Amino acid sequence: MRLDAGRSLWLLILALTAVRLWAAAVIPLTEDEAYYRLWSQHLHFGYYDHPPMIAWWIWLGTTLAGDTPLGVRLLPVLGAAVTTWLTADLARRLGGGARTALLAALAYNAMLTIGAGGLIATPDAPAILFWAATLAVLGRIATGGSPRLWLLAGLTAGLACISKYSALFLAPGVFLWLLSTAENRRRLATPWPWSAVGVAGLVFATNLAWNATHGWLTFEKQFGRVEPSQFRPGYLGEFLTTQFVLLNPLIAVLAGVGVWAGMRSRGRVGRLDLSLPLLAALPFCLYLAIHSLHDRVQAHWPATVFAAFALAAAAAVEARPRGWRPRVLGGGLILGAAAMAGVLAWAGLQGPPINSRTDPLLPIRGWPQFAGEVEAARVRTGAEWVGVAHYGALSQLAATGRIEAPLVHLIERERWPDAGPAPVDKPGLVLDKSRRLSLADLQACFRSVTPVGELVRGVPTSRVDRYPLFRVEGPVEGLLARGCPDELGKNRRRQAAAPIPPPRGAWPAQRTGGGS
């Protein structure tokens, strides 16, 4: 029996979700995922690095599926499935048929960032979903939907903004779309678009209020990126090259054809009107290009606009259904499927390093065994707490549940607004990668510092991470305010702005189980 495009879309979504659920269950957590997992155990309206949505998602996922990698990633996996459907739905709303919708969904998941990364629990996951949801609602409004849908669009846009601040660029993008045609400009004369702004503002105000009572922690962390610095145009080439690869080179070619055609015809490419997704993406894309003139753009930052490029690729193929374009799309789908299968299988089965110098899986390898060795060293040395210099190491150790004593982050204490008093007045075991921690650092922080060995994490036949161990006693006064290494100046500036409220709990928790 030959499947129609509509049924094929649902089979695609189900198949991809099944694969991602398997991978989510067997691939160990990354450092950032383990970090956000700790957030989820102390729910707030904001955190040091990002708005709160990913913590809420992980809390719900671990409530439903347990404190496991699958629980941490459950909502991101389901979110990727919903985003695929929303992308297909938007293709239909913009003038395409069922086949166009299927092509858009295929192109979207063939993108390397989405195909292999669509299960990772980072703030990008909810931001991508709510950005796509906002466009899907606006697509319904544009095709005759009730004006009351503007309220839903405001809600989804607000949720995108408390997922990741880059979603703030959605507002000027939608405004550009509203200015683009006479019909859209007439919508601005009604109260509905402005009501959407109000709803989005109310949602975002929850995070604003949290920041106002916590020294504007997240704003200082994130918006510090926009400070002017030295002109380095070489980053622009790196940015464009990286995104060309991560979009999937063949899909990127088709997306470029679609975007170019849309620019020449006021957004229309074949039967599809791409003005909404392309104009909505434009301000963020311009910001990323400008940012790349002075600093590096991280590979995952543009992921929220990838659905727009998938729609452009599908439109390019549908506009010329004969010739080279369908063949390029077919090649892109094969490349995307192979890359997704290869990456997920290699990570899920903990495949071997590439060579003696390169092991991309090193950041997620061997944490349970390593934590067991740390705990054994703690017991052997009589330490009553374990200290680290990096949030990722602390988060990974906590996720294993194998450390039977309090874990203490010796710097950046502002990451943990609920942190209770740390027992640093008692003997402790301090460790971290050798490049992050030195004997001299600790001797400035503790009166007694004794090297007690070294632990290694990784595959012996390739590059490994080495962690020197130190037994410490007698902290200097104000150790945690200064940080170790010393961060006193940074903390004093922050505390002068607005002191962090007094501790209200114990974070990180002593026994924070869950496997990685």
What residues fall within each predicted segment?
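Short helix- or helix-capping micro-motifs
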Residues: 13, 101-109, 157, 161, ...
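Specific aromatic-rich, kink-prone transmembrane helix
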Residues: 41, 84-86, 126-144, 149-157, ...
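Transmembrane-lumen/periplasm boundary regions of multi-pass, lipid-linked membrane glycan transferases
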Residues: 19, 159, 171-274, 280-295
